[in-house]
Amino acid sequence: EVTGSCNLVIVNYPNGEKTRFIVDCGLFQESDYSQYNASFPFNAENIEFCVVTHNHVDHTGRLPLLVKKGFTGEIYTSKATAILLPLALADSYKVLKDVAKRNNAKQLYSESDVAETLRHVSATDYFTKSVDINPNIRLTMFKNGHLIGAALILIQVRYKGYPNINLLFTGDYNNKNIFSNIPKLRKAVKTLPLTIIQESTYGTTNSDEVTECFEENVLNCIKSGGTVVNMAFSLGRFQEILYKLKTMQDE
């Protein structure tokens, strides 16, 4: 299901101390799962930091709820995601407000929760600069073609006298993007002993077949005198459709 992405990581150090953090904090969108939106399976006050892979509501939509419930740490994103996040969260708020009104239910979070959430955002460069979040944890982001601002997240856990633990979170991954050059993951990263946490929503999708089918359907519709209506349900999709239609027009 494309919904509610939120990975809790608990690091247990040899001295008995712990670090708790999450990667993404998404909204459950399907009605069958909406009952899970109101709470977390952890105490938000105990989460030291959050890292965001990309700016889609199923990965960011509950960030204001996290803050509302007591989270006080940093929210690490790429620079592009930091720019787009206010728009995405404002849209999420409006949608949730309408849903709550229709169902005569309590709203998940307020506009002030959204504003407070944005004050926690810390924008990070891709791969040129790692962030030492604390003495034991280093964060590095790498470009991901899923959407502008999307990132592969490398978390390295370090403790003196012990080998590093390297966690790679892919988010929704794509190795290409029509608006941006996506470099291959560096050899220095690929040769690390990695634990990879991978999203697999589109893992069996052949994108070339989808593109060919789209072109064929659009052309057939136009030739028969019809009108093409394209539904674009998330950030990035709409821009890709417009670009594709312009390319077809030029050809």
What are these regions (language model features)?
Residues E1-V51, H56-T60, L65-E240, K246-Q249:
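His/Asp/Glu-rich metal-coordinating catalytic cores
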